[in-house]
Amino acid sequence: MDRINTSAAPPTSPDWERLRADFPLLQRHVHGKPLIYFDNANTAQKPQAVITATDTFYRRHNANISRAVHTLGTEATEAYEATRAALATLLNVPMHELVLCSGTTFAINLIAYSWALPRLRTGDVILVSRMEHHANIVPWQLIAERTGARIQVADILPNGTLDLDALHTLMTPQVKLLAITHVSNVLGTVNPIHDICRQARQRGITTVVDGSQAAPHRHINIPAIGCDFYAITGHKLYGPTGTGALWARREHLHIMPPFLGGGEMIKEVSFDGTLFNTPPHKFEAGTPNIAGFIGLSAAVDYVRRIGIDQIETRETELLAHLTEELQKIDGMRLFGTAPNKAAVVSFMIEGTHAHDLATLLDLEGVAVRSGQHCAHPLLQYYGVTATCRASLAFYNTHEEIERFITALLKVRKLLG
């Protein structure tokens, strides 16, 4: 069989400049200047291996999965399931406990409507942290409205770390669910997720972990974390948009009803009733983003060949350099100075607005994000309506950081 190759990947010993060349978009110019892409927490750029894998699928293997015995259908199905296997290896979980979906937002809503909605009652508590992305707040608000449950918020300390004493105090018998991010998309704070999940499990609290910002940058060993649910997003992991995965404990998957109905999630259908498929397939109704998941498989292979520990070390070095240079700027305010951080820095300069900074930086070829970063309650805590956020990936360089600082100083001068 003409197999889909998703493993055209870099050398085992990282040569960061060579790896950077694997990303076609990083070669472009913006407003006549070399692009500096510092918006990786928003989405990561895609290596050529990912682009080639999706292109090859459409050129040579395009067919639906699990619905045909012909050669193309078999090839597509095998390649799609190979993605599940690659993700399972990355996260150290069994394949049959991994639901493929469109991303973390879908995954959390799946948990909300299939696990929480049938179980929560008036008086129950859903515990979330101040630093959550809206995708890990709004679904729980919707469930609370429908069930009579209450939402309580675990607050943070000024340096952007969770107030762990307060969190543990809030873990009362009324708390049935704890929804928490592994890594903050605004602050970069890496939460002590192993300890938090252990404390919750001792109290009989079900845990949902948003791993969107963690999976691309850190080694994830889900059994060691000890959570009940863990969700990731493919497009932040150098894969295509519209891809992601939800891991759930086997006992949860078997008792949860399907979230959506349609093809593939059934075994038998009659007008008298339907027999659903077994997990994880009963949660995968309809035709998925097949090409996207094949691209995600290539992305996972690419990351594993570099080594996630190598990536973390590289990004930690870049973060230290960026933070040091930002702290030298008069009027600079950094949000989130936790001792354990991913390569995300949110900042403001006194007397300027985040959108003005980002707009003028774009004219210098620099891409950063400005706004509230889908985390309104967190910015309210800091008393601001918007920040700029620079977020790094392994393919960024120290030279880019120097150019970014030069551009930032120029913009600051223009804004007076």
From Swiss-Prot:
EC number of this enzyme: 2.8.1.7
Cofactor annotation: pyridoxal 5'-phosphate
UniProt modified residues of type N6-(pyridoxal phosphate)lysine: K236
GO molecular-function terms, A-Z: cysteine desulfurase activity; pyridoxal phosphate binding
The protein's name in its UniProt record: Probable cysteine desulfurase
Keyword Kinase on entry: no
Catalytically driven reaction(s): (sulfur carrier)-H + L-cysteine = (sulfur carrier)-SH + L-alanine
Keyword terms of this UniProt record: Pyridoxal phosphate, Transferase
InterPro entries: Aminotrans_V_dom, Aminotrans_V_PyrdxlP_BS, Cys_dSase_SufS, Cysteine_dSase, PyrdxlP-dep_Trfase, PyrdxlP-dep_Trfase_major, PyrdxlP-dep_Trfase_small
Keyword Metal-binding: no
Listed GO biological process terms: cysteine metabolic process
SUPFAM superfamilies per record: PLP-dependent transferases
NCBIfam families linked: sufS (TIGR01979)
Task of the protein: Catalyzes the removal of elemental sulfur and selenium atoms from L-cysteine, L-cystine, L-selenocysteine, and L-selenocystine to produce L-alanine.
Catalytic machinery residues: C374
